[in-house]
UniProtKB/Swiss-Prot annotation:
This is Lymphocyte function-associated antigen 3. The chain crosses the membrane at residues 216-238. One of its GO terms (biological process) is cell-cell adhesion. It comes from the Eukaryota. GO terms for cellular component: cell surface; extracellular exosome; ficolin-1-rich granule membrane; membrane; plasma membrane; secretory granule membrane. Ligand of the T-lymphocyte CD2 glycoprotein. This interaction is important in mediating thymocyte interactions with thymic epithelial cells, antigen-independent and -dependent interactions of T-lymphocytes with target cells and antigen-presenting cells and the T-lymphocyte rosetting with erythrocytes. In addition, the LFA-3/CD2 interaction may prime response by both the CD2+ and LFA-3+ cells. Changing residue 49 to Q: No effect on CD2-binding. Disulfide bonds join 142-187. Residues 30-121 form the Ig-like domain. Keywords: Cell membrane, Disulfide bond, Glycoprotein, Immunoglobulin domain, Membrane, Signal, Transmembrane, Transmembrane helix.
Length: 250
């Protein structure tokens, strides 16, 4: 009987722990949050119980504190943060790159420390599309401008066109010149906050061959004229740069 009640209590404790995990009251890992430079971001705390004491920290440094109903913000966060005294959620305004870090919230009313990792991103620029001919194929590359250095590792690539190649999530794709080429292809860059798209017309990647064909076709014409002139001159029919003999036979 005792064993049965112990098992029941253990099951009950396990159920409570699972519920706490589900509702976010126990946090073993940092929740990833994304914000944009000069924007704002909120660390949401799932609590409906009014909190009398709250401490927010960035690593080991204090960010904001609520104690005895008195709110204080610290260092560079002064006049840039708002604390919801009911839930404990913290909002940071006018984000800068230096705000990026791990934040944690502590309160006697919450079982464990809440942790968040903030990524501060810059607006995503439009991609640059270039193309080149390589061994009978057209290579199209989608590139990020060199000056953009904000979390390149978070950027994903996607293509849009009716061909199989566009299903790849890579920085470059290839098209055979003998295939029916799509009129336009698009490349999209995306990260957790932004996406931008650029397009290119594939036919502009192929150099025009019409002028080269006419140029090469005209080459034999002057050669034929020169050859004919030489043959006629050698046979005495055409005399170049010679005046006729006007001496009187008398």
């Amino acid at each position: 009987m005792v064993a049965g009640s112990d098992a029941g209590r253990a099951l009950g404790v396990l159920s409570v722990v699972c519920l706490l995990h589900c509702f976010g009251f126990i946090s073993c890992f940092s929740q990833q949050i994304y914000g944009v430079v000069y924007g704002n971001v909120t660390f949401h705390v799932p609590s409906n119980v009014p909190l009398k004491e709250v401490l927010w920290k960035k690593q080991k440094d204090k960010v904001a504190e609520l104690e005895n109903s008195e709110f204080r913000a610290f260092s560079s966060f002064k006049n840039r943060v708002y604390l919801d005294t009911v839930s404990g959620s913290l909002t940071i305004y006018n984000l800068t790159s230096s705000d990026e870090d791990e934040y944690e919230m502590e309160s006697p009313n919450i079982t464990d420390t809440m942790k968040f990792f903030l990524y501060v991103l810059e607006s995503l620029p439009s991609p640059t599309l270039t193309c080149a001919l390589t061994n009978g194929s057209i290579e199209v590359q989608c590139m990020i401008p060199e000056h953009y250095n904000s979390h390149r590792g978070l950027i994903m690539y996607s293509w849009d066109c009716p061909m199989e190649q566009c299903k790849r999530n890579s920085t470059s794709i290839y098209f055979k010149m003998e295939n029916d080429l799509p009129q336009k292809i698009q490349c999209t860059l995306s990260n957790p906050l932004f996406n931008t798209t650029s397009s290119i017309i594939l036919t502009t990647c192929i150099p025009s061959s019409g002028h080269s064909r006419h140029r090469y076709a005209l080459i034999p014409i002057p050669l034929a004229v020169i050859t004919t002139c030489i043959v006629l001159y050698m046979n005495g029919i055409l005399k170049c740069d010679r005046k006729p003999d006007r001496t009187n036979s008398n």
